[in-house]
């Protein structure tokens, strides 16, 4: 009689497991904060600190053990202590990814930067309709459905998960294997995928505030960036196309309704936490863009675009826009600019922006479509004023979809940067110059109208890598000029000695 095949052990669900571990009282710093057990804290010490101990990683290790990921199967005893130390960063990353993906918890406070007691405070979410299942637990990615080539290649799904979302960064995996393996590990750790980006924005639209509500531009105050005015005919030499009419307005780029980012009100605790608990932290959508608009170096607008698509316009936004429509970003009026020549040219440029510049996130790429007569040049580089070289400036063709940023390229460069295989930090700041060629030799900050876009996901990943000690600074080229602490007293003493000498 043939034996029935042994059934695999049921997969451990993170939410139920974590609640049990909190109630066990076996972990220092992991505890409930209220009698109703709706609010708890998790110790969260940065692993680069010198006072890190085994207890600081105990809860992260416990999750790896519960998943069967530790200890590794080997003969001749357990792994050495140094092997466990090398795995701690990965344990913490997997724990963080599981904590976010389960949707059973919402972060109330982030005190991980507290030098005396680093921790985070979470509460149970009221969204009980989100039930845990094997698909929602994405702490460790399964075999990828299609791995992108290390250099370029057609877009395709990165991971095989379907119930996933972009996550905030954790430490990238230690370099092991070839460059392709490193890129795959980085993508797995960051939970970035084509359909993940779409799912984080495009599923089940929820009502939100009308675009622009509660988000106002910065007032035009302070001194204007200096510099002589432009020659009278300079503007029309490159800025405005000579086509007689803007032509028919293209159809919307999106093929389906896109969702607005999840409303913070949907992440309230299931039960009221203790009075000491503060409100939930409003973390931007993983694909959010930090938008800065500058008029000749002067910042006139800063806002976060959390929608999968947006349109840059000049003039008041349409009050009838729906939550599922592209988010509208309005250029502020240059009326308060003190330089009248700059004001006149800026106004002329902005009038030709209509019917707008459209941005849309498609999978791992950000696409742009210029619909107005005002020419727009784009490039990707470092922050303003940095010495990091930028990509060659390119003109956005009119009424044509153009990819201007690829997350896959960024993560490949980030892995090389972390492995010390790349001198400069990866570039992720996107510049859009309206009416002036960014490659003309002038500083970008001197452009009449400059839009700076920073993907939130890229910034936090790079900052996390830099906090691990990776830097683009070359110590061999640094020459620090410091005064001697005693130089002043030495000069005074020499002066007094000269006074005592006979003439």
UniProtKB/Swiss-Prot annotation:
Could you tell me the superkingdom of the organism this chain comes from?
A: Eukaryota
Q: Where is this cross-link: Glycyl lysine isopeptide (Lys-Gly) (interchain with G-Cter in ubiquitin)?
A: 375
Entries under PROSITE patterns matching the protein: IRF_1, IRF_2
Q: Which GO terms describe its molecular function?
A: DNA binding; DNA-binding transcription factor activity, RNA polymerase II-specific; RNA polymerase II cis-regulatory region sequence-specific DNA binding; sequence-specific double-stranded DNA binding
Q: SMART domains recorded for this chain?
A: IRF, IRF-3
Which InterPro entries does UniProt cross-reference here?
Interferon_reg_fac_CS, Interferon_reg_fact_DNA-bd_dom, Interferon_reg_factor-3, SMAD-like_dom_sf, SMAD_FHA_dom_sf, WH-like_DNA-bd_sf, WH_DNA-bd_sf
Q: Report the outcome of residue 151 to A.
A: No effect on cleavage by enterovirus 71
| Residue location of crosslink Glycyl lysine isopeptide (Lys-Gly) (interchain with G-Cter in SUMO) | 444, 446
Q: Which residues cross the membrane?
A: none
Annotated positions for site (Microbial infection) Cleavage: 167-168, 189-190
Question: What does the entry say induces or represses the expression of this protein?
Answer: By type I interferon (IFN) and viruses.
State the family named in the UniProt similarity comment for this chain.
Belongs to the IRF family.
PANTHER family in UniProt: INTERFERON REGULATORY FACTOR (PTHR11949), INTERFERON REGULATORY FACTOR 7 (PTHR11949:SF2)
Q: How does it assemble?
A: Monomer. Homodimer; phosphorylation-induced. Heterodimer with IRF3. Interacts with TICAM1 and TICAM2. Interacts with MYD88 and TRAF6. Interacts with TRIM35. Interacts with NMI; the interaction is direct and leads to the inhibition of IRF7-mediated type I IFN production. Interacts with GBP4; preventing interaction between TRAF6 and IRF7, resulting in impaired TRAF6-mediated IRF7 ubiquitination.
Q: What is this protein called?
A: Interferon regulatory factor 7
Species in which this protein is naturally found: Homo sapiens
């Amino acid at each position: 009689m043939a034996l029935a095949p042994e059934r695999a052990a049921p997969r451990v669900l993170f939410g139920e497991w974590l609640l049990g571990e909190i109630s066990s009282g076996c972990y220092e710093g992991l505890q409930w904060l209220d009698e109703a057990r709706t609010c708890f804290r998790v110790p969260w010490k940065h692993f680069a600190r010198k006072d890190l101990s085994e207890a600081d990683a105990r809860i992260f290790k416990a999750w790896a053990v519960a998943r069967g990921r530790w200890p590794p199967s080997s003969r001749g005893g357990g792994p050495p202590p140094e092997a466990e130390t090398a795995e701690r960063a990965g344990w913490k990353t997997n724990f963080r990814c599981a904590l976010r993906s389960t949707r059973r918890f919402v972060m109330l406070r982030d005190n991980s930067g507290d030098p005396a007691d680093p921790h985070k405070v979470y509460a149970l979410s009221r969204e009980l309709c989100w039930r845990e299942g094997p698909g929602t637990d994405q702490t460790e990615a399964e075999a990828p459905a299609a791995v992108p080539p290390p250099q370029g290649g057609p877009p395709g799904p990165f991971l095989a998960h379907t119930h996933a979302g972009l996550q905030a960064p954790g430490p990238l995996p230690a370099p092991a294997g070839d460059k392709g393996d490193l890129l795959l590990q980085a993508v797995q750790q960051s939970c970035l995928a084509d359909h993940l980006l779409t799912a984080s924005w495009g599923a089940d639209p929820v009502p939100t505030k009308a675009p622009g509500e509660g988000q106002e531009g910065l007032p035009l105050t302070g001194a204007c960036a200096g510099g002589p005015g432009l020659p009278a005919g300079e503007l029309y030499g490159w800025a405005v196309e000579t086509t007689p009419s803007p032509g028919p307005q293209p159809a919307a780029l999106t093929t389906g309704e896109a969702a607005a980012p999840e409303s913070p009100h949907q992440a309230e605790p299931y039960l009221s936490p203790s009075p000491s608990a503060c409100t939930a932290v409003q973390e931007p959508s993983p694909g959010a863009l930090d938008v800065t608009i500058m008029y000749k170096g002067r910042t006139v607008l800063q806002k976060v675009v959390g929608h999968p698509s947006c349109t840059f316009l000049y003039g008041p936004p349409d009050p009838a826009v729906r939550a599922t429509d592209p988010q509208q970003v309005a250029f502020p009026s240059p009326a308060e600019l003190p330089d009248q020549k700059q004001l006149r040219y800026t106004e002329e440029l902005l009038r030709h922006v209509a019917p707008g510049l459209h941005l849309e996130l498609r999978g791992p790429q950000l696409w742009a479509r210029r619909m107005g007569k005002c020419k727009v040049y784009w490039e990707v580089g470092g922050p303003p004023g940095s010495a990091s070289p930028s990509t060659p400036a390119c003109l956005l063709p009119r009424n044509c979809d153009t990819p201007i940023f690829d997350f896959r390229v960024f993560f490949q460069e980030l892995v090389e940067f972390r492995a010390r295989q790349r001198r400069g930090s990866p570039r992720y700041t996107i510049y859009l110059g309206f009416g002036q060629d960014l490659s003309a030799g002038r500083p970008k900050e001197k452009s009449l109208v400059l839009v700076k876009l920073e993907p939130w996901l890229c910034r936090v990943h790079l900052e996390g890598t830099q906090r691990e000690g990776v830097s683009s600074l070359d110590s061999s080229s640094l020459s620090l000029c410091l005064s001697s602490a005693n130089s002043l007293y030495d000069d005074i003493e020499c002066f007094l000695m000269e006074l005592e000498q006979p003439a």
